[in-house]
Amino acid sequence: MRIDILSKEYPPAIYGGAGVHVTELVSALRARGDLDVRVHAFGHPREEDGTTGHPDLTELTGANAALTTLGVDLSLAAACEGADLVHSHTWYANMGGHLASLMGDIPHVLTAHSLEPMRPWKAEQLGGGYRVSSWVEKTAYEAADAVIAVSAGMREDILRSYPSVDPERVKVVHNGIDSELWQRAVDEDVVRRHGVDPDRPSIIFVGRITRQKGLPYLLRAAAELPPEVQLVLLAGAPDTPEIMAEVESLIETLRETRDGVVWVPTMLPRNEVVAMLSSA
């Protein structure tokens, strides 16, 4: 059985949780040994066997990001010819999965990591493209053969956002974790290198700078932390310049009244994230 997985993110280009999810899913499916798992990701060519990168169409250079995305989706759909099942992740790849399903008369499964109707602030990022991304998602969800929600709450949100979707087609499959990779591992050298004092208590945030993560709320609340507590932020990949500016301003204000505010704006290797989490 051939399964084609479509995703905007895939190593080495990962900036959020959906990319991590897809990476682990592909690894687990390929480990079975009885499936032909192919990955179609946005961006540059990949060296991994069975994985293809699909760059932006040069004809759409400078266009709204939503239109650029649709250009890549056409490439994804064409590449899925011959697949038995297509599985797409996030609105970026959903239209690729939908078109592949129509062209090949094959099942389309999609996993819901977020929902466009619940992220109206994305109009800051995409402008009119937000209406396009919302249309893409609605079209794909209503036509999909199955929709995977990563939580019961997400399932409720899907059915509320898209009431015409048959509830029987929406299944919950919770996100998992590789407990062998994410073992506690103290490494004070790594912690100190990033400016954290391992002898002081700390609270840590790991995630993208995006509205749904609620980082500005944390930064405002952090003013109430005991003075000996450090606030460690492993936060980058902002959705928009506006939220980046807001976070930068809040961090600057917080640092005026307390020390121990550590911000690492780059994405760290997993072993360093483990070390930072282990010190919190």
Set out the residue ranges of the language-model regions.
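Short alpha-helical donor nucleotide-sugar binding micro-motif in glycosyltransferases
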Residues: 274-280
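Nucleotide-activated donor-binding/catalytic signature segment of Leloir-type glycosyltransferases, i.e.
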Residues: 200, 235, 244-271
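Nucleotide-sugar donor phosphate/pyrophosphate-binding loop at the beta->alpha transition
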Residues: 107, 117-139, 156
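Short His-centered aromatic/hydrophobic patch
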Residues: 88-93, 112
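A short helix/loop element that forms part of the nucleotide-sugar donor recognition site in Leloir-type
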Residues: 183-196, 247
